[in-house]
Amino acid sequence: MTIKFLSESTINRIAAGEVIERPASVVKELVENAVDASSTKIDIVLERAGKNLIIISDDGIGMTDKELEIAVERHTTSKFDESDFLNINTFGFRGEALPSIAAISKMLITSKKRDADKAFQIKLIGGNEKQVTISVHNEGTKIEIRDLFFATPARLKFLRADKTELAATVDVVKKIALAHPKISFSLTHDGKNLLKLKGQNKDAETNLKQRIIDVIGDDFIKNAAYIDFKTPDFSICGYTSSPTYNRASSEDQFLFINNRSVKDKLLQVALRVAYQDYLARDRYPICAIFLQIDPQLVDVNVHPAKAEVRFHDPNYVRNLLIEAIKNALTNKSHVTSTTIASDALELFKNPLVNKQSPVSKVINVNSKSADYRPTTHSTLNTVPQNHVCQKLIDTLSHAKIEQEVENRIEHEQQTRKQYKLGAAKAQLHTTYIISQTEDSIVITDQHAAHERLGYEKIKDYLKTEELIKQRLLIPEIVELLNEKKADCLYDHREKLYKLGLTLEKFGEKSIIVTEIPNILGDVNVQKLIQDLADHLSDFGKNIALTELIEHVTETYACHYSIRAGRKLSADEMNALLRQMENTPLSGQCNHGRPTYIELKLKDIERLFGR
């Protein structure tokens, strides 16, 4: 076949294939154009999820008749100077969107320049039959797109159901609206209003907060930490959720570079790393984070849809984002999700109580009875007492802490005011600590709480150059489920040795352990090694040292901590609460579960109609 030039309409249809994938792509390009046009109000109207009709109206600067005629040609733009290609501050700059959309639809554009006497209109069908006429219109621009993909029926066949396409469009509008809280947005579908967002005109932080409430929800703000982080050429602001407020997917993560919504793997990995100490691997935080960076340090001209970016120094950006998120979480370190307490109160409103069953016995810290035995047998009671649990008791024997605990018992009223988690009143089911503050009741999961304390302590311990090990009097032989798990541990033996664990292969699927970290005390070695093998076997030989340390720390912390089913004295309970108050991120264990919930007295009173 002879080589020949493609026609202009064919070129535009090919370009549309890169830029326009679905109705949401059209809405994204046209709404971003409206934002670039200094609009303060943008209205979107859809029919059949945009397949039949898309209308975008704005009150921006508008266009003259000559600008209107040029705007629908390829590679025409008013948004940047050719001499300043590395300093792009607008959404659009390629000059591809309008001609690409026009090539696959029936387009009508009506526009009036600000302070102009006349409005003008241009009509295109499949990118052809361009005709500019005088029209009547308010200041700004209105673009109507009908019969999307009529000129490319093959693409039309690949569109999803209306519900799916509409959801994609709503997501696009929400992201743009989050980045521009001063602009009012409305979205209507088949006559039904789906979004109505009022523009905010206060200070930047207040504007952003209100827009996030309107788009993501007030519940998120109540359970989120505010980020405010700056360097000379970089700034990060926004909100990120407390670890206990999480999701099963990353869909609710909104990340922006210079107000441009991006799906960048570097940023997603940084977010994951920032939460690795606080969330299970199958849970994801919610966030709306905005990074402002010198345009010359980021390349947005990587992908036609501009969803991906390239940083001049990616590691620098990654490390700054991790630091910013960790700082924000640390400042909100003792706060657990408010929704957990709300859910608990909802259950109280409709209790599922068996009237035949007696109320379970509660251990009162003021009771002198020593003959209490749990009514329910727990296999955990057969596990040897952990050396670290004894350390917690030993810590209390120090004169200073002893005196502190005595003072708190003697001056309970003062304790309620002075300490966030209050004074311990009872232990429920040898698992939960009930404490009282000035205006609330706090229920603490003793295992989850001590696991967080242990996690932070062991994390610091593993950073020390000289790890103290204890040699087992009798080496422990641990038989694993299969040879793969045994090989996995053996493959990592040198790294594990540096983390305080000495082991060797013993047969096909067994490991012999000769030394363990001293901090673990009288730990159940069998269970420790089995759990560690389960953690590591999914990763094989290629796991990074940082990930290995994370897995080892989690496993150590779980075996280090006080178990459910262990009776605690008043002194031990109060000591645990005080340690929580002084430990970063003690509101959740390292799996993202809450360590305590707080029930406000006013909410409890409402349950009783007071």
Swiss-Prot record:
<dbReference type="InterPro" id="IPR014790">
    <property type="entry name" value="MutL_C"/>
</dbReference>
<comment type="similarity">
    <text>Belongs to the DNA mismatch repair MutL/HexB family.</text>
</comment>
<keyword id="KW-0227">DNA damage</keyword>
<dbReference type="InterPro" id="IPR002099">
    <property type="entry name" value="MutL/Mlh/PMS"/>
</dbReference>
<dbReference type="InterPro" id="IPR042120">
    <property type="entry name" value="MutL_C_dimsub"/>
</dbReference>
<dbReference type="GO" id="GO:0005524">
    <property type="term" value="F:ATP binding"/>
</dbReference>
<comment type="function">
    <text>This protein is involved in the repair of mismatches in DNA. It is required for dam-dependent methyl-directed DNA mismatch repair. May act as a 'molecular matchmaker', a protein that promotes the formation of a stable complex between two or more DNA-binding proteins in an ATP-dependent manner without itself being part of a final effector complex.</text>
</comment>
<dbReference type="GO" id="GO:0030983">
    <property type="term" value="F:mismatched DNA binding"/>
</dbReference>
<dbReference type="InterPro" id="IPR042121">
    <property type="entry name" value="MutL_C_regsub"/>
</dbReference>
<dbReference type="Pfam" id="PF13589">
    <property type="entry name" value="HATPase_c_3"/>
</dbReference>
<keyword id="KW-0234">DNA repair</keyword>
<dbReference type="InterPro" id="IPR014721">
    <property type="entry name" value="Ribsml_uS5_D2-typ_fold_subgr"/>
</dbReference>
<dbReference type="GO" id="GO:0140664">
    <property type="term" value="F:ATP-dependent DNA damage sensor activity"/>
</dbReference>
<dbReference type="GO" id="GO:0032300">
    <property type="term" value="C:mismatch repair complex"/>
</dbReference>
<dbReference type="InterPro" id="IPR036890">
    <property type="entry name" value="HATPase_C_sf"/>
</dbReference>
<dbReference type="Pfam" id="PF08676">
    <property type="entry name" value="MutL_C"/>
</dbReference>
<dbReference type="Pfam" id="PF01119">
    <property type="entry name" value="DNA_mis_repair"/>
</dbReference>
<dbReference type="InterPro" id="IPR020568">
    <property type="entry name" value="Ribosomal_Su5_D2-typ_SF"/>
</dbReference>
<dbReference type="InterPro" id="IPR014762">
    <property type="entry name" value="DNA_mismatch_repair_CS"/>
</dbReference>
<dbReference type="InterPro" id="IPR013507">
    <property type="entry name" value="DNA_mismatch_S5_2-like"/>
</dbReference>
<dbReference type="InterPro" id="IPR020667">
    <property type="entry name" value="DNA_mismatch_repair_MutL"/>
</dbReference>
<dbReference type="GO" id="GO:0006298">
    <property type="term" value="P:mismatch repair"/>
</dbReference>
<dbReference type="GO" id="GO:0016887">
    <property type="term" value="F:ATP hydrolysis activity"/>
</dbReference>
<dbReference type="InterPro" id="IPR038973">
    <property type="entry name" value="MutL/Mlh/Pms-like"/>
</dbReference>
<dbReference type="InterPro" id="IPR037198">
    <property type="entry name" value="MutL_C_sf"/>
</dbReference>
<protein>
    <recommendedName>
        <fullName>DNA mismatch repair protein MutL</fullName>
    </recommendedName>
</protein>
